[in-house]
Amino acid sequence: MMLNSSTEDGIKRIQDDCPKAGRHNYIFVMIPTLYSIIFVVGIFGNSLAVIVIYFYMKLKTVASVFLLNLALADLCFLLTLPLWAVYTAMEYRWPFGNYLCKIASASVSFNLYASVFLLTCLSIDRYLAIVHPMKSRLRRTMLVAKVTCIIIWLLAGLASLPAIIHRNVFFIENTNITVCAFHYESQNSTLPIGLGLTKNILGFLFPFLIILTSYTLIWKALKKAYEIQKNKPRNDDIFKIIMAIVLFFFFSWVPHQIFTFLDVLIQLGVIHDCRIADIVDTAMPITICIAYFNNCLNPLFYGFLGKKFKKYFLQLLKYIPPKAKSHSNLSTKMSTLSYRPSDNVSSSSKKPVPCFEVE
């Protein structure tokens, strides 16, 4: 917990009540290494995903629009990751100035909200495409998808404003280091608890409930369709993938959200124990690695479930250029979930079973 002291040379000077919290040699080695791995893998994977979706698949479906925007949001975040790697390797000494402190912090916040919102919209799109394919046709258009993505980027930018406003460079007098951190003028301020709860609720809880509901309804619809056509072999991979998508999202973000909430309690002075502060400050960068590494893999995780994406991705790796004219159908970001024309899965046993193509 930090307490305000004075201002000198434009940089606020503060005291740290728990100066040793989170400051361990293994953190200063492990975290920059993990950040570097995330940067290389993320830049490579997301850049290829953008090329495949835009140049090979020609951006023809709603799902491809969401997937492309997810990859672009990840790339925006990844470009700032070397700054955080250097910051941690220098034992939390920020050498890049106040401007980059704000931009890099806003990028982290922006990626969180943009990615989560895009995944939520994708789950709704998959629900409409599978459970209500005919009724949702007029709503599931490229124009609607693009407008939705613009709104998501605006909302994510709005949610990132607190990082630009309140994240600054501070000089900690009792440790003699300059840090890039959040600092609130009053311990009684409602601002930190408000920002923390916004991140917990808007950045995780509500999106998770929507994603869980969407895929649960998809699960039930597919299960019902299999029961109608009992003579058809059941593809259990479909249900495993639905379960994997939900669990992948949940376990990627839960640790980070929990420690974010604990960090808010420390900032407010509710938690005074430096031992707990040490646990939180030590665990926080690890949870960030888990959340954002999984986040940066999302375009590949979802894309590789589709035959078209996988095919063109491998072509790109072999330096095979895209054809001048493409008739490909990117079927999802979660990928090729297709539903054969019927909005009523139980209406007729003669109708084809809905299929979740996993290639």
From Swiss-Prot:
Q: For this UniProt entry, which segments traverse the membrane?
A: 26-55, 62-89, 99-125, 142-165, 191-216, 240-268, 279-304
Q: How is it modified after translation?
A: C-terminal Ser or Thr residues may be phosphorylated.
Q: Could you give one GO CC term from the UniProt record?
A: external side of plasma membrane
**Keywords in alphabetical order:** Cell membrane, Disulfide bond, G-protein coupled receptor, Glycoprotein, Lipoprotein, Membrane, Palmitate, Phosphoprotein, Receptor, Transducer, Transmembrane, Transmembrane helix
Methyltransferase: is it a keyword of this entry?
no
What's a GO biological-process term for it? positive regulation of cytosolic calcium ion concentration
PROSITE patterns cross-referenced by the UniProt entry? G_PROTEIN_RECEP_F1_1, G_PROTEIN_RECEP_F1_2
Q: Which residues bind angiotensin II?
A: 15, 17, 167, 182-184, 199
Q: Which residues lie on this side of the membrane: Cytoplasmic?
A: 56-61, 126-141, 217-239, 305-359
Subunit-level organization: Interacts with MAS1. Interacts with ARRB1. Interacts with FLNA (via filamin repeat 21); increases PKA-mediated phosphorylation of FLNA.
Q: What is this protein called?
A: Type-1 angiotensin II receptor
Q: Which gene encodes it?
A: AGTR1
